[in-house]
């Protein structure tokens, strides 16, 4: 690691759970960061594979490593990160989130911090910076140069409506400033994911900045695989029960997704509604009410507030029918 005297300290938060296999590689990549001063805070969520013991070993040999013990038990990933963010909020100026199984590229902190300072220089406000990722397999072999291209994700424009409806930000690439932490914390129970919540607050009362360059080797393995291919043909009759079951499952999943994002929108309205533009506030308030509506009113609201031209006719129709 190389540092400069002017480099601000970045507090890194990492929630762990049974991550012993890849944690050492993550730590090596953190120590290799260019022009960066950092501390890392871990919170383990009840691992039984030796993760906690490995974290204690890291902490015993490097004063920059801290393991928090808050006696809250298993919280799940969203609220484990929420607890970490809350823990560092009183002292941190800048915070990055990290996933236990990823590897950071050496320039990650340097270019993210440069963009942060540019954004803060234009207008002091809550800022979230995020980047593209390079997709790799479990052994770090290349899969795709761009996660955004692989998943057809367009990070811009980052409007309130887009961010409320779709998670545009990947937590492992995020850098946030103190002004955003002051607005976003504590992470509410209604948050779908901690990174989604941070992005929603940032776009509502500050700035979301996207860097079109990978800074993370995004490891795909097991349940983490992106866009796993399915067989194109398995025999229509054999697949009929599967298709019926899938249709029912997708309908339930679509409904849950709408309700979860609507509940998160309600929490967003309560947190920063007064500082939103009138148009954004009208959208967030209306969208947050969807779970309380009857069938016809719900369909109309989904058509009005959830469907978007960029999704295409079929996706919008499916969303309205299933939602």
Show where each model-derived region lies.
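Nucleotide-sugar donor-binding/catalytic module of glycosyltransferases
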Residues: 2-231
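C-terminal subregions of glycosyltransferases and related glycan-biosynthesis enzymes
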Residues: 164, 190-192, 196-197, 217-323
């Amino acid at each position: 690691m190389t540092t400069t005297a002017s480099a601000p300290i970045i507090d890194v938060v990492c929630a762990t759970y049974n991550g012993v296999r890849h944690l050492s590689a993550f730590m090596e990549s953190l120590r290799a960061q260019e022009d960066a001063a950092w501390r890392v805070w871990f919170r383990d969520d009840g691992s039984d594979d030796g993760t906690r013991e490995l974290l204690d070993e890291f902490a015993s040999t490097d004063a920059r490593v801290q393991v928090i013990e808050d006696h809250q038990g298993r919280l799940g990933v969203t609220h484990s990160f929420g607890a970490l963010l809350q823990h560092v909020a009183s002292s941190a100026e800048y915070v990055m989130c990290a996933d236990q199984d990823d590897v950071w590229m050496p320039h990650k902190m340097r270019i993210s911090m440069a963009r942060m300072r540019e954004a803060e220089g234009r207008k002091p406000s809550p800022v979230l910076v995020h980047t593209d990722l390079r997709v790799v397999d479990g052994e770090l072999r290349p899969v795709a140069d761009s996660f955004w291209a692989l998943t057809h994700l367009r990070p811009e424009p980052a409007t309130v409506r887009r961010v409320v409806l779709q998670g545009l930000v990947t937590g492992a690439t995020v850098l946030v400033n103190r002004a955003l932490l002051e607005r976003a914390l504590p992470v509410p129970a209604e948050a779908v994911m901690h990174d989604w919540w941070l992005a929603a607050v940032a776009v509502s009362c500050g700035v979301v900045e996207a860097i079109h360059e990978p800074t993370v080797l995004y490891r795909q393995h097991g349940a983490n695989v992106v866009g796993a291919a399915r067989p194109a043909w398995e025999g229509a009759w054999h697949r009929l029960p599967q298709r019926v079951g899938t249709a029912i499952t997708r309908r339930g999943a679509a409904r849950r997704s709408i309700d979860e994002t609507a509940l998160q929108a309600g929490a967003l309205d309560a947190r920063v509604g007064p500082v939103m533009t009138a148009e954004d506030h009208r959208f967030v308030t209306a969208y947050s009410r969807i779970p309380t509506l009857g069938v016809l009113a719900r369909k109309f609201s989904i058509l009005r507030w959830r469907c978007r031209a960029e999704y295409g006719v079929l996706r919008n129709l499916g969303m309205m029918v299933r939602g």
